């Protein structure tokens, strides 16, 4: 089953967008789904329901960061190479969705919904598959 389909099922079962995306990659991350679920709980509805950065996008950034980090705690050395890749992910998400913030995506101020939450979850997963795991359409 595709990650995007797994994530949508999780979202339909009550996970927030960040939880749905992050937990869909538990196996690839080598992490426990319960821990990922807890870690991403506060990222729903644009960070704690503030309508800030989309939760699905935040989760995608967490996945990419986890895969790129060298985890050298005594000498953090991978930030410089990770940040540009995160920026590329942000640009790709914005190109596909039309915005980065939940407020703008949901059209809170304009009344113009750019993308439904389920589609944001799907797009975030597709971008992770393509940009992090180099899998197109799998």
Give the label of every model feature segment.
Residues 28-38, 66-85:
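Phosphate-handling active-site elements
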Residues 24-42, 96-102:
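Acidic-glycine-rich active-site phosphate/pyrophosphate-binding loop
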Residues 23-27, 62-69, 126-130:
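Short glycine/serine- and small hydrophobic-enriched flexible loop segments
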Residues 1-29:
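Active-site-proximal helix-loop elements at catalytic-domain edges
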Residues 21, 25, 39-44, 60, ...:
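Short alpha-helical scaffolding segments that buttress acidic/His motifs in well-ordered protein cores
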Residues 17, 54, 102:
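Short cysteine clusters
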Residues 81-138:
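C-terminal binding/interaction regions
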Residues 43-62:
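Glycine/serine-rich anion-binding loops at beta->alpha junctions
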